[in-house]
Each structure stands twice: as structure tokens, then as C-alpha cells.
């Protein structure tokens, strides 16, 4: 019982999937009151013979990060102190570093990175293209109301293609010639009856989906030529592109849309639901009820889980594959105001980022619900959108008229190792 009070010892096995940091798989007797700090000291002493001392680790006990004393963690999990405990250790993900601040003339409500380019959308109705080194390339007028979402369709050495959506009820397709730095509107996509809040391009870049305040989900062609229109002329000559499909089911605004695969999408809404749509059936495949309006949602192709951002300051984790559709897998505490935006890493299975009205971005590990890995500070007003499409950069836009660019800590270390 002494260990339960943080006094006595606990038998543990230290395990890792990173073989170069492995220690002998034998029981170790450690004090029940240890935290991550003491475990790091203990583990680094064991690793001295491998020349790996000085490495910072995080520790997983029953699939959750240790964030306090070991005895408190075990008590919370109702784990017997008499049993040998497996503790998994992983090299700590390095802290992202602030790299740049991109100044705009109005709120930045949409950001999306692709390679060395950053696409931004603003409340002054303009789209902007920047390099990830902070050089402004182009300001693009066209919409007649604030931009709400942007996404890249394709990118090569000569051209970039992207889509933007706006409170003006339209989506617009664009083609940018990189060499001449000239942009052309390929099509104006009309069909929504209220502002278009969300957009996502399909994995094959042939279609894109939009979600609107009119509660409708619409699917559009992303091709330069849309044969259904009977012409391949540009919008200056041919006018409007119409949706390929309209799907109804939400009762309030669709705030998030993402392709899960070539025929499946997930949407999040202010109506407190996540819906998974089957485009082949042209209907809802799964519905997950939540207890709060959803401002954003992100699906991970690596772990097949969905994380949501809501008005109650929390993020929540769901599994659309389970029959228990209303059960939350985890709740993440740390923001102090509405959480407006969230996105999974597309290379790190357990990591995601969020941005909030509390002016902060946070980097999370989904196995650490009690605290984020890092706070990413810099914005002076509420954060409106965050993006981690480029694994090397976390990019966010806010009501302080700036885009903040953070370099991934892992990218920083890789650069140092190659010098």
C-alpha cells in the first residue's frame, strides 16, 4: 500500500519500439512517486552504455502519457500496484520552432500549404500566395465576400491549381502559372444558397466537396474542362459550373468536410453530428452524435480516427468504425476558449494540431488527453485556421491579420543532421 501513497516501490518493465534505445527487459524497482523527470534520469542512466544519454523521452502507461506521478496514474486507471507494470517509452517529439509571420490586411480565415507554397484566404475577399520563407507572390481578387476555405488541387513545376470558397455562396477554381506569376479563374461554381464554409479536394484530384451554411454537401468536378457543361471554355466565356451531386442530411451549417477515401467523406456540423457519406449510395453511411456544435473535424488516414473542435474549449476523438457512435474515445483539455480548427499530421500517426479563440495553437499526441505536447504561441487574436499538410511546417491564420509559420521540430533536427 505504500506505493499507492507515492511512497514505496513499483515493479516496472521498460519497453520501446525504438530498438536503438532498448534496455534489458528485466523488472526494475522504482519509487511510486516518480514522474517523467525522474524516469528520464533513470532511463538515461541505463542508456549510458549505448552512448544515448541526454535523450528526452515520454512515457506511456496503459496507452496514455504519464503527466503526473506514476502512483496517481495507476490509481486513476484502477491498476493494482502489486503487479509488474509495463512502461513504454518513446523519444519526445521535438518542439516546433517559430519561423515567420506573414502580414495581411485583414483576418486570415483559411490556410493551406503545398510544397514550398502557402495559400491564404482573407476577410478582405482576397486570396494570397506566399513562399514558406515568407515572400509574398500574389494577391488574387475575385470573391465578393470573405474567404472561408482554400485547398490545393494539384501542383507541378509549371502550374498550381486550387479552389477557394466564400461567404459569397460560391467556390472558384483557379490556375496559377508559376513562371509568369499570373493566375486565371477557371470556373465559378454556383449552387449553394448560403456561404460556403468548407472545401476538400478528393485524393485523385478529380473532384472536390463543399459544405455550406445552407446545410448541403455538394460534389463538383475539379477538372480544367467539365464536359457536363458542354464546353471547355474558361469562365470568362462560359460562366458557371454546377455540382455533380448534392447530398442532404445535416440540419445546420457544415463546418468541415474531408475525403476518407475515393468514395467516402466525413462532415462535421453545427447540428452536433459527424456524418460519414457513401458517394456510391449517395447517402449517409454512419452518423455520430456529439454534445456540442462542431467547428472543425479532421480524419487521419494513418489511424482512421476523427478529432473534432468545438465550442466548449475541448477536442474529442471518435472512431467512425464503431457501432457505439456516440461514445467519445478521448477528450483533450487545454484550450481556454472555443476551439476553431484542428488537423491531424499526415506523417505522424498520433499527432494533431489545434487553434483556438484563446489565441493559441497546440500540438497534441492523441495518447495525452490531459495536456498538449506544446503550446505554439504568436497570434495576438483568435486563431481561425490551422494546417499541417506539409509535414515540415505548421501554418495558422488568425484575426490578428497574420499567418504564423512554425517549423516542425523533427524537420529542424533533420536539417541539423544533414549539415
Curated annotation (Swiss-Prot):
GO CC annotations, alphabetized: nucleoplasm; PeBoW complex; preribosome, large subunit precursor
Region annotated Ubiquitin-like (UBL) domain, chain positions: 10-91
Start and stop residues of the WD repeats: 103-140, 142-184, 191-230, 249-287, 289-328, 334-374, 378-416
Signal peptide: none
UniProt entry tagged with the keyword Repeat: yes
Protein family per UniProt: Belongs to the WD repeat WDR12/YTM1 family.
Protein name: Ribosome biogenesis protein WDR12 homolog
Amino acid at each position: 500500500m505504500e506505493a499507492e501513497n507515492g511512497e514505496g516501490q513499483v515493479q516496472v518493465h521498460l519497453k520501446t519500439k525504438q530498438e536503438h534505445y532498448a534496455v534489458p527487459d528485466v523488472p526494475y524497482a522504482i519509487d511510486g512517486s516518480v514522474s517523467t523527470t525522474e524516469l528520464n534520469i533513470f532511463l538515461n542512466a541505463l542508456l549510458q552504455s549505448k552512448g544515448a544519454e541526454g535523450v528526452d523521452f515520454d512515457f506511456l502507461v496503459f496507452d496514455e502519457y504519464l503527466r503526473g506521478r506514476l502512483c496517481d496514474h495507476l490509481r486513476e486507471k484502477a491498476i493494482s500496484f502489486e503487479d509488474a507494470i509495463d512502461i513504454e517509452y518513446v523519444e519526445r517529439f521535438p518542439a516546433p520552432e517559430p519561423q515567420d509571420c506573414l502580414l495581411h490586411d485583414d483576418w486570415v480565415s483559411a490556410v493551406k500549404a503545398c510544397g514550398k507554397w502557402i495559400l491564404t484566404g482573407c476577410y478582405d475577399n482576397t486570396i494570397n500566395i506566399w513562399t514558406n520563407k515568407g515572400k509574398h507572390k500574389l494577391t488574387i481578387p475575385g470573391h465578393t465576400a470573405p474567404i472561408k476555405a482554400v485547398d490545393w488541387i494539384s501542383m507541378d513545376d509549371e502550374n498550381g491549381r486550387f479552389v477557394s470558397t466564400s461567404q459569397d455562396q460560391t467556390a472558384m477554381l483557379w490556375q496559377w502559372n508559376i513562371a509568369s506569376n499570373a493566375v486565371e479563374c477557371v470556373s465559378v461554381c454556383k449552387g449553394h444558397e448560403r456561404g460556403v464554409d468548407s472545401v476538400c479536394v478528393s485524393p485523385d484530384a478529380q473532384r472536390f466537396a463543399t459544405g455550406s451554411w445552407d446545410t448541403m454537401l455538394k460534389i463538383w468536378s475539379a477538372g480544367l474542362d467539365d464536359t457536363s457543361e458542354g464546353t471547355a471554355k474558361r469562365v470568362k466565356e462560359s460562366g458557371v459550373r454546377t455540382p455533380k451531386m448534392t447530398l442532404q442530411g445535416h440540419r445546420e451549417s457544415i463546418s468541415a468536410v474531408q475525403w476518407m477515401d475515393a468514395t467516402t467523406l466525413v462532415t462535421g456540423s453545427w447540428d452536433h453530428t459527424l456524418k460519414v457519406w457513401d458517394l456510391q449510395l449517395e447517402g449517409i453511411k454512419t452518423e455520430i452524435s456529439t454534445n456540442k456544435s462542431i467547428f472543425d473535424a479532421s480524419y487521419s488516414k494513418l489511424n482512421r480516427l476523427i478529432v473534432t473542435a468545438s465550442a466548449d474549449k475541448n477536442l474529442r476523438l471518435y472512431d467512425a468504425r464503431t457501432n457505439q457512435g456516440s461514445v467519445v474515445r478521448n477528450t483533450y483539455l487545454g484550450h481556454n476558449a472555443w476551439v476553431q480548427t484542428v488537423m491531424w499530421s499526415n506523417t505522424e500517426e498520433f499527432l494533431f494540431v489545434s487553434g483556438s479563440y484563446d489565441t493559441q495553437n497546440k500540438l497534441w499526441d492523441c495518447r495525452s488527453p490531459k495536456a498538449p505536447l506544446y503550446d505554439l504561441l504568436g497570434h495576438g487574436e483568435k486563431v481561425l485556421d490551422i494546417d499541417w499538410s506539409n509535414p515540415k511546417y505548421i501554418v495558422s491564420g488568425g484575426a490578428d491579420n497574420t499567418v504564423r509559420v512554425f517549423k516542425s521540430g523533427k524537420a529542424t533536427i533533420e536539417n541539423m543532421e544533414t549539415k
